[in-house]
Amino acid sequence: MKHLHRFFSSDASGGIILIIAAALAMLMANMGATSGWYHDFLETPVQLRVGALEINKNMLLWINDALMAVFFLLIGLEVKRELMQGSLASLRQAAFPVIAAIGGMIVPALLYLAFNYSDPVTREGWAIPAATDIAFALGVLALLGSRVPLALKIFLMALAIIDDLGAIIIIALFYTSDLSIVSLGVAAFAIAVLALLNLCGVRRTGVYILVGAVLWTAVLKSGVHATLAGVIVGFFIPLKEKHGRSPAKRLEHVLHPWVAYLILPLFAFANAGVSLQGVTMDGLTSMLPLGIIAGLLIGKPLGISLFCWLALRFKLAHLPQGTTYQQIMAVGILCGIGFTMSIFIASLAFGNIDPELINWAKLGILIGSLLSAVVGYSWLRARLNAPA
C-alpha cells in the first residue's frame, strides 16, 4: 500500500498509466484473440433517453464526446485559475509562455502543411501537431525528479495550458460541422444562465454542473464539438475564496484524479488501438504520418525555441528564474508529445472522411510523441547534469 500511495503521489503516475493504456490498446487491436473484442467494445451502442430527448452513440463516441468534456472542464478550471491567480495572472508573467505557445502552434502546423498542402483531404489535419498532451509531458518531466527547477515545471504547465486553450479555439473555429440554430439558441440560453449564476454569487457547484449538462446536450446537437461545453462551464464556476473555500479549486481537486487515472487512460485505450495489419513502409512514409511526425518532433521545439529566442532578443519577456535557454529548448521537445490531444483533433479532422486516414494519423502521432518523449527526456537530462 505504501508503494502504491507513493506511485499515485508522483507527478509521473498519470503519464505512466497513459502509456500502459495505449500499449494495451495497441496489443489488443493487433492480437487475433482480442482484436474482435476490442472493436466490439468500442462499437457497443449506448442510449440515453430523457423524455423526448434521445442520444444514441457508440462507446467510442461517448468517451470522446462526454468523458472528454469532463477533461475540458478541468482544463477550463486550470486556465481560469492561472489567468486570475497563477503564472498567467500578469502580462509580465504570461508573456514568455504565451509567446512560446504561439510559436509551438504555428510552426508545427506550417511544417505539416509543407508536407500535405497539395492534398485537400489530408490538409484538414493541419492542427494535429499543434497540440500538447499536458499529462504525458509533465509525466516525462517528473521522471527527472527534484533536479528539474520549479520555474521550468511552471513554464511547461503554463505553456501546455495556453496550448490547450489554442486547441479549444481551433476546434471551435475549424472543426465544427453544420450548425443547428435552435440548439445554438438553447446553448446561448444555458451560457446566459451560467453567467447569471456567477454574477449572483451562487457557489453551489452542482447547480453549475446541472446547467452544464443542458449546455453539453445543446452543443452536442448544435454541430459544435460538445467538449467545448466543459471549458465554458469551467470558466463560470466561482474561483474566489469565501470562508476559506473556492468552488473552482475544490472541483479541480476532485476532478484531477478522475481525469488523470480514468478519463485520459480510457480515452487513450479507446483511441490508440491502431491495427498494424496492412501497414507498409510506403504508407508510413506517406505525407500524412510524415507531416505529423515532423510537426511534433521538429516543428514543436523549433517553434517554441525560435519564438522564445525572439522574445528574449527583443526584450518582450525574460527567462524564468533559475532556468537556461537550453532547458527551454528541451521542454520544447517534450511539448512534441501530442498523444491524446493530437489523437482527439485527428478524430475530428478525419472522422467523417476515411477511417484509414485516422489510422495513419494515429501512427504518426504515436511515433512522433514517442520520439519527442525520448529525445526530450535525454536532452533535458543532459542539460540538467551540465555545469552551469
Curated annotation (Swiss-Prot):
<dbReference type="InterPro" id="IPR023171">
    <property type="entry name" value="Na/H_antiporter_dom_sf"/>
</dbReference>
<keyword id="KW-0739">Sodium transport</keyword>
<keyword id="KW-1003">Cell membrane</keyword>
<feature type="transmembrane region" description="Helical">
    <location>
        <begin position="254"/>
        <end position="274"/>
    </location>
</feature>
<protein>
    <recommendedName>
        <fullName>Na(+)/H(+) antiporter NhaA</fullName>
    </recommendedName>
</protein>
<feature type="transmembrane region" description="Helical">
    <location>
        <begin position="14"/>
        <end position="34"/>
    </location>
</feature>
<dbReference type="GO" id="GO:0015385">
    <property type="term" value="F:sodium:proton antiporter activity"/>
</dbReference>
<keyword id="KW-0915">Sodium</keyword>
<feature type="transmembrane region" description="Helical">
    <location>
        <begin position="219"/>
        <end position="239"/>
    </location>
</feature>
<comment type="similarity">
    <text>Belongs to the NhaA Na(+)/H(+) (TC 2.A.33) antiporter family.</text>
</comment>
<dbReference type="GO" id="GO:0005886">
    <property type="term" value="C:plasma membrane"/>
</dbReference>
<feature type="transmembrane region" description="Helical">
    <location>
        <begin position="125"/>
        <end position="145"/>
    </location>
</feature>
<comment type="function">
    <text>Na(+)/H(+) antiporter that extrudes sodium in exchange for external protons.</text>
</comment>
<keyword id="KW-0050">Antiport</keyword>
<feature type="transmembrane region" description="Helical">
    <location>
        <begin position="59"/>
        <end position="79"/>
    </location>
</feature>
<feature type="transmembrane region" description="Helical">
    <location>
        <begin position="328"/>
        <end position="348"/>
    </location>
</feature>
<feature type="transmembrane region" description="Helical">
    <location>
        <begin position="95"/>
        <end position="115"/>
    </location>
</feature>
<keyword id="KW-0472">Membrane</keyword>
<keyword id="KW-1133">Transmembrane helix</keyword>
<keyword id="KW-0406">Ion transport</keyword>
<feature type="transmembrane region" description="Helical">
    <location>
        <begin position="154"/>
        <end position="174"/>
    </location>
</feature>
<keyword id="KW-0812">Transmembrane</keyword>
<dbReference type="Pfam" id="PF06965">
    <property type="entry name" value="Na_H_antiport_1"/>
</dbReference>
<keyword id="KW-0813">Transport</keyword>
<feature type="transmembrane region" description="Helical">
    <location>
        <begin position="360"/>
        <end position="380"/>
    </location>
</feature>
<dbReference type="GO" id="GO:0006885">
    <property type="term" value="P:regulation of pH"/>
</dbReference>
<feature type="transmembrane region" description="Helical">
    <location>
        <begin position="292"/>
        <end position="312"/>
    </location>
</feature>
<feature type="transmembrane region" description="Helical">
    <location>
        <begin position="179"/>
        <end position="199"/>
    </location>
</feature>
<dbReference type="InterPro" id="IPR004670">
    <property type="entry name" value="NhaA"/>
</dbReference>
<keyword id="KW-0997">Cell inner membrane</keyword>
